């Protein structure tokens, strides 16, 4: 399933807030955003199950939970407005749904930046088949 998602992202040119989320990650981590995290651990990328493998994976778990609480728009396809001011990400939408999506992405990007020391290459390209522990609740 995750393979299909990454192919879809490549084919559609990373539209909507996925590219915006990637931009936020780039600014907060200095990494190549989405592609540094797309297959990381049990929760970074499409879907997720099991126990987050480390603090970086937990950022993705919390992000998934946040997206799950958004009502009124599709978080992965919505385009919102945001800016960078003095190194901070500022969400600027009046639409409550778009603002919520932006806040989910903002918090995750900050979380990635704060937890870069936990990023472990052994969790890159991690298979969901290895995520066997019981899933946590949001």
From Swiss-Prot:
> Its catalytic activity?
a 1,2-diacyl-sn-glycero-3-phosphocholine + H2O = a 1-acyl-sn-glycero-3-phosphocholine + a fatty acid + H(+)
Q: Give any Gene Ontology cellular component.
A: extracellular region
Q: How is the cofactor bound?
A: Binds 1 Ca(2+) ion.
Name the organs or tissues of expression: Expressed by the venom gland.
Which Gene Ontology MF annotations are present? calcium ion binding; calcium-dependent phospholipase A2 activity; phospholipid binding; toxin activity
Q: Quote the CDD domains the UniProt record gives.
A: PLA2c
- Pfam families per record: Phospholip_A2_1 (PF00068)
Organism superkingdom: Eukaryota
Q: What class of enzyme is it?
A: hydrolase
Alphabetized UniProt keyword annotations:
Calcium, Disulfide bond, Hemostasis impairing toxin, Hydrolase, Lipid degradation, Lipid metabolism, Metal-binding, Platelet aggregation inhibiting toxin, Secreted, Signal, Toxin
For the ligand (Ca(2+)), the binding residues are: 43, 45, 47, 64
Q: List the disulfide bonds.
A: 42-131, 44-60, 59-111, 65-138, 66-104, 73-97, 91-102
Q: What is its EC number?
A: 3.1.1.4
Family of this protein: Belongs to the phospholipase A2 family. Group II subfamily. D49 sub-subfamily.
Q: How does it assemble?
A: Monomer.
Record's protein name: Acidic phospholipase A2 1
Annotated organism of origin? Macrovipera lebetinus (Levantine viper)
Give the source lineage, highest ranks first.
Eukaryota, Metazoa, Chordata, Craniata, Vertebrata
